[in-house]
């Protein structure tokens, strides 16, 4: 919408707080902060420790934002919301004497810069660094109190050296299930050598040759290579993690089709930490919504592992309903299951139902045709297909509950990446199984009474029927009894299963961290020694991976780094002489650099370690005295979007726990407290074709919206939602800073509502924050002369009480991130001072200090004009006097038969009989009673008087 910017008129008083003056003040104080290192914060040890050797303050506060990706579009007004909120929080605690660490880096690896490089031939680093310069300029205008010395980008070689180092720590570790923690791989080897850990298969470590030993060790690593079914996106030329695929089976970035494909890929064994990732959610101060999302993503469920025997070996399934085993009338494997090719019969058994054959002459032909037919389907499409399809393998399995032979099928609704990739099908208890059985004419056996399985599956509680020794039991009892029978028969065991899959940790792109891994002539992977780090990303002649038709499911990835042959092929001495090796040509996913960056903020110049233990312990170590005995440690406040709940936040927790297990950090969680900020949204406008038009040019007229386009005025439709360049409703913070000043933008965004709530942007409302700051300015500065107005007058009682209520209220609000209510209290107090023409220093100085977290530039300038030298950034924040927080008098509404007829004010400590007497003497109450004697008078202390007549 078209708005008129605030600009000084010719008759504007010379010293009025205008956008021009605000800009001058802001630039001056930002320079002063930079020159003085105002926001530089000391570490206990290292290059950022106090030069005089003094100790750092015991009270600290580590505040962190989810750092931005430096896109080419720059910032719009929605982006700074969280950054301003954390700055207010950090400034408040800094003013209370805390040693506050607040810094901001950039998550700079990723697809957008690479795509731009492909299109233009410009190196991604060139584009990324230019974007970072612009981001720093835009964020710098906001007056954010960051320690600029601690800023970095994940693309900095000195940074990703330590990303590679962490990868090697995880690669060279294994998870000891007995101790429930990661341990160095050398300790596993030592146990094998000593014979305290069994190799398996009846062999000893001494029986194994070098290759077999390496294979055994590699199978235990927390990072491993696996031939697994992955999400292949031909349109992006790379594989994707499950978390990067949308619910409808497309890539989050680019919206390309994603296909399931078997490839050899790096995986991280995050599943080993499933229980700890779940359990430690209970000790985190995080939003319930995020905790629920992580719990659902990890998806812990209890049940039984069951083995169905076949001629080709056991088929293992996991079921949460072992009680229904007598109702398992067939089995289904994922088409990609390892056993499929071994189970396929050479010919159809006699009497095979034609519906089971897929129209093929042999089971092998049917399997091949079926696999080809589903190759282009996403996981979601496979699971949501209303028409059930499948192929009989010509093989049977033995149901361990009753010994019956059940046919084995493959079907697309069973996925290789979930559970064991095989199910026991109980059509009476699962609707998908029921649909499949109905489609293929398979038996449906009722095993839990309570429904009509001829109509649909029944999954509720009831009494067991048609279930042999389980008959008559309830479901819970039957689950336990069947599990015990399976254990006794050697055909199963109780088990916990998770939805969480291991983390696919490789991308066939260019702009990412290279793997610190090489392969020998036999194709075996070797982690590089730490002394060979960093492995720097080389320049390539062409940044693009071999791209494919987005629908070409049969395509194969070809990473750009494979083109740099003189980088790929190297001669190295890894401890056994100089030998030829080849480098891994994949790069790490975009989540790698953001999985540990909180640690680097604590020690950004350390060249010997990712951070000194003393610095990590100071900034992130557990503080049970402050946070309770179960405090996991971590960053004190982390603010960012809820969209990262099961991506960045889960991955960073996993990495941090591995580092904790290996003794590199003292905190077992990276983020003690998390707050998800809401979104700033705005109106957008579309013409009759659905095309967006510039929102700033739209005019509202007679309840309609028109756009004065090149062909004349056009009526447009209004919609509400995200802010973005593509929606043509983006408002730059530069524009608001130019027209009102950065402090006005800060106050406006913090005043819009609770931080966690989404809120609508309205440029026309910014003027309210602007006028508030003008009123604060006028209380201290004469607009005509520029003189400071502060006097040494004493404060009246009403002002004193309001002052101290405001101090107490804003302090509590700032500490609780309720910046909107803090602003409201400051506006109320400012209005009182303005209305009462209060110019007393005793009223103005606390106001300036309280305003400082919200509007720091204005506050600094006023503090200086009030005669103070130096910055107020380190306070002190005013303290409330408890004496003025207690009211001397109390106002009681007086009700007569339930309706308020008058009000009386009495001393706060007045006894009930005195309150009653005052109420009965109130003029309006006396008139209403008109001589009648009350039957009863009820005094509710501090609240009301009720007279019953």
Swiss-Prot record:
Keywords recorded for this protein, A-Z: Aminoacyl-tRNA synthetase, ATP-binding, Cytoplasm, Ligase, Nucleotide-binding, Protein biosynthesis
InterPro entries listed in its UniProt record: aa-tRNA-synth_I_CS (IPR001412), Leu-tRNA-ligase (IPR002302), Leu_tRNA-synth_edit (IPR025709), M/V/L/I-tRNA-synth_anticd-bd (IPR013155), Methionyl/Leucyl_tRNA_Synth (IPR015413), Rossmann-like_a/b/a_fold (IPR014729), tRNAsynth_Ia_anticodon-bd (IPR009080), Val/Leu/Ile-tRNA-synth_edit (IPR009008)
EC number: 6.1.1.4
Binding site for ATP: 725
Nucleotide-binding keyword on record: yes
SUPFAM superfamilies registered for this protein in UniProt: Anticodon-binding domain of a subclass of class I aminoacyl-tRNA synthetases, Nucleotidylyl transferase, ValRS/IleRS/LeuRS editing domain
Region called Disordered, residue ranges: 540-562
Subcellular location field: Cytoplasm
Protein's GO biological process: leucyl-tRNA aminoacylation
EC supergroup of this enzyme: ligase
Protein name per UniProt: Leucine--tRNA ligase
A molecular function GO annotation: leucine-tRNA ligase activity
GO cellular component, one term: cytosol
Cross-referenced PROSITE patterns: AA_TRNA_LIGASE_I
Keyword Phosphoprotein: no
Superkingdom of the organism of origin: Bacteria
Residue window of motif 'KMSKS' region: 722-726
Catalytic activity: tRNA(Leu) + L-leucine + ATP = L-leucyl-tRNA(Leu) + AMP + diphosphate
Motif ('HIGH' region): 68-79
